[in-house]
Amino acid sequence: RQMCIRDRYTVVDFHYAGGVKQVMKQLAGKIHTDAPTIYGDTTWGELLDSVKSAPNKVIHSLEDPVAKEPGLKIMRGNISPAGAIVRPTAVYEEVKYIKGAAKVYECDQDAYRAIMAGEIVAGDILVIRYEGCKGAPGMKELMLSIDALIGLGLDKKVGLITDARFSGFNYGAIVGHV
């Protein structure tokens, strides 16, 4: 299987390129190498001492990234001082900077009903709460509202903020894991 939709390399290629250990070796200056590994009796630093740094066509170095824009960014602000996640490459130019009225809903189903009833319009910021790890059981994936926005062509016109998680296939101004 491919590792990501636009990639030509498989998980087997990733394994032969050094796998997780090679990725961690490339990140050694950015991670806590004194942290224990899953094995419990070694640290990442001890484990990575035996790994030769060998960036290649599958696993790139930090100096030669696959993409200039990161796949994920952590955002902090008054809504989420502890942080939230956005996928910068998935945010349409039209909604990269959006300012509008916040419309707050207590669950995905309520927000979905509001979208379908025409209560959410271009320029609105849809806030869906209580769907994250402290709300819905199991931190479910937000789908109904996002799919409705896409289906109605509002994904390029409406912002969405939620404590839930969302699919890696979603596009638009979606801030999750608040």
Region spans (language model):
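Catalytic or ion-coupling anion/metal-binding cores of large enzyme and transporter domains
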Residues: 2, 6-178
